[in-house]
Amino acid sequence: LRARLRALSVSLAAAIEPAAIDPAPSPARARMEAALATVGGDQPEVVAIYVLVPDDGAGRMHFAADWDRRAGEQVAPGTAYDAAGVPLLMAAVRGPQVEREVVADAWGPTLSGYAPVVDAAGRPVAILGVDIAASTIAAREREAIRRAAALFGVAALLLVAIGAVVGR
């Protein structure tokens, strides 16, 4: 999942034109919003994709764009976000980052990947984030445990059967 978050955030960030960050309607902004919606719609485990613009080095940011699968959770451009408690989000201005643990915020617990949106000179102008819900991660972990238990059970039965045959 972490590799997928990294790949999604990096590829989407690279596709965003710096002009799209401006909240005024423009073709670049329309392309960015369409890209977020298309990728989000095509990736069922993704719950949110957003673009944040750093306002200062202390973690204050604002939303430039937001796509959210959850009804009523989409955030309007210009809405403030305090990233001071999310160090990897703040570090994403220097390069792609993926959370190692689930982080909870006002929208719930998620695992997130971040990548910088850069201008023509390579300067970061925004950060693109991709979130996967913690419930998705928990479901995948439960499935992995179920599969491991099933394999262990099959292996144990085979060992018992082999032991019975060899013991005769």
Predicted regions and their residues:
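Juxtamembrane alpha-helical signal-transduction segment immediately C-terminal to a transmembrane helix
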Residues: L1, R140, A144, G163-R168
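Juxtamembrane extracytoplasmic/periplasmic/luminal helical "stalk" adjacent to the first N-terminal
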Residues: L1-P25
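Extracytoplasmic/periplasmic sensor domains and loops in membrane signaling proteins
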Residues: D66-A104
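A short beta-strand signature within small-molecule sensing/ligand-binding domains used
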Residues: Q97-V98, W107-P116
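Short, hydrophobic beta-strand elements of compact beta-sandwich sensory domains
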Residues: G113-A138
